[in-house]
Amino acid sequence: MMKWKNLFILFLLLFNIENAFSKNTKFYPPPSDRVKTNIDFDWKFISRDFPCEEETHQVNELPWQTVHLPHDWSIEGPFLREQNTTQGFLPMTIGWYKKSIFLPECYEHKKVFIVFDGVYRSSDVWMNYAHIGHHESGYTSFVYDLTDYVRFGNRIPNGLRVRVDARRHEQDMYEGCGIYRHAWLVVTNKLHVAYWGAFISTSKVSRAKATIEVKTKVKNENCTSRKCKLTTKIIDAEGIVVAEMAESHSIPANSEYEFIQRAQIDRPHLWSLDDPYLYKAYSIIQDDDIIVDTYETIFGIRTFRFDSQKGFFLNGERIKLRGFNAHYDFAGLGTALPDRIHWNAMMAMKKAGFNFYRSSHNPATPERLDVCDQIGMLVWDEIERKLESHEVELALVRETIVRDRNHPSVILWSLENESPLEGTVYGTSIISAATALAHKLDPTRLTTFAASMPVNKKGYGDAVDVVSYNYHWKRADQDHIDNPHWKIGLLSEYSAARGRRGVYGIEHFRRAEDDAYFDLYNGMVQNMYQMCSRVESYWRRIKAREYFAGGCLWSGIDAWGEGNVWPLVSRGDGALDLCFFPKDVYYYFVSQWTEAPMVHIFPHWNWEGKEGQPIDVWCYTNCDSVELLLNDHSLGIQARPPEPAFWTPDSIDNVPPAKSETQVEHLEWKVPYEPGTIRASGLRAGQSVCIQEIHTTGKPAKINLCRLMTDFVHESEIEPVIADGRDIVVIKAAILDEAENVVPTADNLVNFYVERDEKIIGVGNGNIASHEPNKATSRKAYNGLCVAIIQSTQTAGEFTVRATSPGLISDRIKIKSIAPEPVKIVVFAKPYRLSKLDQTSTITAEIQDKFGSIILTAENKVTFKLNGPALFENDTDTFTTNAINGKAVVKIKPAERGGSVIITALSAGLRSGKVDVIVK
């Protein structure tokens, strides 16, 4: 036995020398017992309630539907007037999920966990009819240990049940219903890093060096003590080891120990907005010299600080936080967002110059934080809204921070939003305790709140690190004077003006939703001019105040819910609508924060019946000046408005505020309407550098299809659709006239078809008063546009999306899907116990993607190695073969009685895997 053990130790030593210590060789993490598998597919769902124990024939015969996660049943409707307006008049009910899980025999001596990234809300989980746990919050992730409740065997089902009660809402917004984020199955050795158990901080950072501290919580769930060795390797983006730490400690049975390790990185590559560089840390656990766990943590190195007079600094550079609020939903899908939607949302905002995302009003989705890390978007991570109680607040603080504290994008933990306890003794008590806990869990980040009431009472403003206000810039000015030591971070919300894409308040017809707007605004229809004016006035004040770190637009993107009055199913206060179509106000930010020459004019130029009447034409630009022309006749040149003068404490007595603060930030012409072409020419140094034209269009004639994100980024920046059954593509349909101009008032019904097995999982048009079904294959255009969301299958290749409409020329677009990238090998053994010398075990190595799904097209060369009392079928301890349909297979046979056999599978560029076989 000692011979086999020594050989395996030598193999691991050579593996690490070859992969870690060569300056020219990428490091690949060594094989371990940890396996993480996504379990999103093939759940059964029903929207009704019954006891879990009622697993009768009657219950099984109910109309359960097959669903895949993420899943939001509320968005399926129907819209009913008697339902809650904050939830978009959509149902909030009780639902049940069930799923059979199969665990191979080789997991029998491991730990088995289930992880839910988010379930809305008040969920209960059963495994094989045993109640595992209850989780109240709809926004924090949670983990359950299933080990004592599951059975093992490829043909033995384990019955998983989840009851979700979404009747009571947490926030005053649309929150959806169901398991709306990913779910995972995690298998580990009994000696393992706890889930979310590694915390990496950078206490001292300069361009020359960075000091890294890694805290790693290791659990020993064996019934005997274990001598644990933890080796932590820091890997740069090229895969090279840049630092390494090692420490050993004896951990008693059924207990845990937190390792604290420190190392120095020379010439660290700092994470920044324009260069979001990421490192990886691998925590490698050895038990008696055998590697049993490898845990990956992604992090970035950067510094930041808030200054009471000068605002925010990132890596020593002063930066204005150009922020936006956003919920977590989308047209047609509700809250059940595929990962690509998070990328679409954050990238669309970043392309306008936004650099700061506030996850109002809940902890951000893990995948959205990953995107922010990757593209360089700072984050305000909101933990709680109400300050419900000490118990609830502190639990949410712990759950959120432990999960999210390694994301370099996160800079602030927000402890409440517009709580009625602001400025009270009880509120100060809760928020002080929350700040203390936040600092204990994460000493590197700061706490804040989003206040709507005075916070200069009862020590409330002193209870957090950064003071932030919703809308009250005058209150912020006074508090800055009265409390000069306060770090007044942001207007955490500003504007809140509503505006519908393509609606200007001068239309000669009425829409169904106009009556609702009249009710809301005392007879005044909110329109795009008013929305833009309000946004301009707020941002102009923010940038005039040096002490302000920045501000967060309310909101960046339209969200379901909070319409306030029937039939509105959304507030409509975003710079993007529910489909991510830009409204005119979006281009205000483009003009403020981007360098490439641009000019944007509005409104559209279809005003039949208003000939000769003056139309207000507004223009946003980052050029020196703009010339406007109507049918090639110049209407004059206007210079870009000047920047505001900086605010000083003396300005506070100016009522109304100084003129420089309230000056508009757009150019404006009154143009007597005549059909034709209106053109804006952006000038720099007197030369035209950009042009936008708007034409009076003809009648709808044809449909044009394209990928939605081409409105924001070049096609080359958009990742191909992945054929994994999870990825999606959003197809935009535009209604064009004969000259191929978008008809800005078109509302034609568009029918979508997919000419393969891909599925249409939702449709939308951005109309906040539409009650059309979200789960459909057709949708009316709203002001010329609509979308369909297409989900991939697990078959790579090309598929065609086609769109038709009565009386219009149809269009089609070809979309290519590619096979998922192979990431890792997972190894199985059947049987995993050998009791006879002539018995064999089949070892199967699966080539898997990042979700833990087998890649059926994979043909990678796989090398098997073993140590222990066994040989491969070729009578050696090494066997190489090619995978077929994603699997490489080999048999082993015992060489002698007694002992453990460890089989490792390796393939170039992939994370290797291992499995144990017991020879009796």
Language-model-detected regions and their locations in the chain:
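Short glycine/proline/serine/threonine-rich loop/turn segments at secondary-structure transition edges
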Residues: 107-111, 150-157, 171, 225, ...
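Non-catalytic, glycine-rich low-complexity segments
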Residues: 23-50, 63-106, 113-121, 159-226, ...
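Short flexible loop/turn segments that cap and initiate beta-strands
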Residues: 57, 226-231, 273-280, 622, ...
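Extended acidic/polar, glycine-enriched regions
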Residues: 153, 217-307, 668-675, 684-685, ...
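Accessory beta-strand-rich segments of carbohydrate-active enzymes
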Residues: 25, 29-30, 44-50, 87, ...
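Extended substrate-binding grooves/exosites of carbohydrate-active enzymes
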Residues: 31, 35, 66-81, 130, ...
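Beta-strand-rich structural segments
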Residues: 214-218, 603, 617-621, 681-682, ...
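Beta-strand-rich binding/interaction modules
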Residues: 127, 209-250, 259, 616-637, ...
